């Protein structure tokens, strides 16, 4: 099993106000979301991940989605300038964490890291 590092951040108290177009958005259950996040972290561990947990940002509802703020490729961590203004304050703690792990590169606007797909481990 290959090992890898996964950065995670549990949902903060404001998570029920996260940006969403889902019709049941008003029914977000914070306790359930936190339990689901713990299950996600456990699945990552079972897959061989070393977990680096970033503390929750209670004032930033979407901050649990760390994959949007940055992505790592080889020896660099690419920091994404998020288009959604309400999410830009998430970057400070992400950048601080990643600087201890990789050389960071600030990308020009706009890119969500969740839009990146690394296919380097796929052999065709």
Q: Predicted segment positions?
A:
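The feature marks the mature, well-folded catalytic cores of soluble enzymes
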Residues: 1-122
């Amino acid at each position: 099993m290959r090992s890898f590092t996964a950065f995670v951040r549990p949902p903060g108290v404001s998570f029920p106000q996260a940006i969403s177009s889902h019709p049941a958005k008003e029914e977000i259950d914070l306790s359930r979301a936190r339990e689901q996040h713990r299950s996600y972290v456990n699945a990552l561990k079972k897959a061989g991940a070393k977990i680096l947990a970033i503390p929750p940002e209670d004032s930033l509802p979407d901050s649990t989605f760390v994959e949007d703020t940055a992505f790592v490729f080889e020896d660099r961590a690419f920091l994404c300038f998020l288009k959604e203004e309400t999410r830009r304050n998430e970057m400070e703690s992400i950048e601080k964490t990643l600087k201890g792990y990789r050389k960071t590169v600030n990308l020009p606007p706009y890119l969500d890291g969740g839009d990146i797909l690394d296919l380097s481990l796929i052999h065709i």
